Curated annotation (Swiss-Prot):
Source lineage: Eukaryota, Viridiplantae, Streptophyta, Embryophyta, Tracheophyta
Transit peptide limits: 1-31
InterPro entries in UniProt: Mit_carrier, Mitochondrial_sb/sol_carrier, Mt_carrier_dom_sf
Tissue: Expressed at low levels in seedlings, leaves, flowers, stems and roots.
The protein's name: Probable S-adenosylmethionine carrier 2, chloroplastic
Similarity comment: Belongs to the mitochondrial carrier (TC 2.A.29) family.
Gene: SAMC2
Length: 345
């Protein structure tokens, strides 16, 4: 009996010990599990908080890509480009036309020739009629082409996209720009009184091809000019935005536009002199072509004559670049905000 009772007590103690031990083990496991879960939760939350902006950015980029592939997006870009380009071109031409007239008269004058300072707005009305569609057409080609090339080319070749888009825009818009330029410069040099008379008499004397006099020299000047000016402008804006870590304001856009215009104006002055001489000569055919024009100018007037009118040209394009790109970016911003509001509504 004593042995049995002793064995029962021993068994009970052992059972209690086992249950106690098991209970402690279970509580340790649970406690350990809770500790691990509590430790893991901040990490998971931290990962989620880091991951959410990335997901949002990816989703945003994907939405933009889908939106850019939408034909409606292309039409909107085209529409906005036509408006911004046309408006900017007209504003610059109207504001700085007298400086352009002075530049043209200086370039045409031979040694000892007198510069006429009257009628500095001669031909402005007819010129604006051509500048509006020409500028609109340029940007209608430039902006969509630029956006398409930037999507295809790597980031380190963005300058190539700007160069190519500028050259292509210049080539397409030259269809309208050249006749406009021919009429403008002949009126600036006093050959005609009004734009309609100029068009009628040029076609009567020289045929329809007279409206495209100096077309080759125009492309020789304007394709490099358009490509360089817009490449310099776009690249400077990219660099400035990266350095400032914000969008540019209106004065900064105007300042960069002025610099890009002035630099490009200096580099392309000889090409502008050649183009002007060929366009204003009319049916007299003093120069037989680009190469003959260069040789004749150097032989008769010296190589310095190729830089005639550089001062007014740089002033005109520098100030013009400031106004042009300032108006351009502001108009783009206004149209973009209106489009965003209508989309959200």
């Amino acid at each position: 009996m004593t042995k049995a009772l002793s064995g029962f007590c021993c068994s009970l103690s052992l059972s209690t010990l086992v249950r106690s031990s098991s209970s402690h083990m279970d509580s340790d496991i649970v406690s350990s599990s809770i500790d691990r879960s509590q430790t893991a939760m901040p990490d998971a939350l931290a990962f989620k908080s880091i991951n959410d902006p990335i997901k949002n950015q990816i989703n945003s980029c994907a939405a933009i890509c889908v939106k850019q592939d939408d034909p409606c997006h292309f039409l909107r870009v085209l529409y906005e480009s036509l408006i911004t380009g046309g408006l900017a071109g007209v504003v610059v031409e109207a504001a700085l036309y007298p400086i352009d007239t002075i530049k043209t008269r200086i370039q045409v004058a031979r040694d000892g020739g007198k510069i006429i300072w009257k009628g500095l707005y001669s031909g402005l009305g007819g010129n604006l009629v051509g500048v509006l569609p020409a500028s609109a057409l340029f940007f209608g080609v430039y902006e969509p082409t630029k956006q398409k090339l930037l999507k295809v080319l790597p980031d380190n070749l963005s300058a190539v996209a700007h160069l190519a888009a500028g050259a292509l825009g210049g080539a397409v818009s030259s269809i309208v720009r050249v006749p406009t330029e021919v009429v403008k410069q002949r009126m600036q040099t006093g050959q005609f009184v009004s734009a309609p008379d100029a068009v009628r008499l040029i076609i009567a004397k020289e045929g329809f091809g007279g409206m495209y006099a100096g077309y080759g020299s125009f492309l020789l000047r304007d394709l490099p000019f358009d490509a360089l000016q817009f490449c310099v402008y776009e690249q400077l804006r990219i660099g400035y935005k990266l350095a400032a870590r914000r969008d540019l304001n209106d004065p900064e856009n105007a300042m960069i536009g002025a610099f890009a215009g002035a630099v490009t104006g200096v580099l392309t002055t000889p090409l502008d002199v050649i183009k002007t001489r060929l366009m204003v000569q009319g049916s007299g055919t003093q120069y037989k072509g680009v190469s003959d024009c260069i040789k004749t100018i150097i032989r008769e007037e010296g190589s310095s004559a190729l830089w005639k009118g550089m001062g007014p040209r740089v002033l005109w394009i520098g100030i013009g670049g400031s106004i042009f790109f300032g108006v351009l970016e502001k108009t783009k911003q206004i149209l973009s905000e209106r489009s965003q509001k209508s989309h959200n509504a």
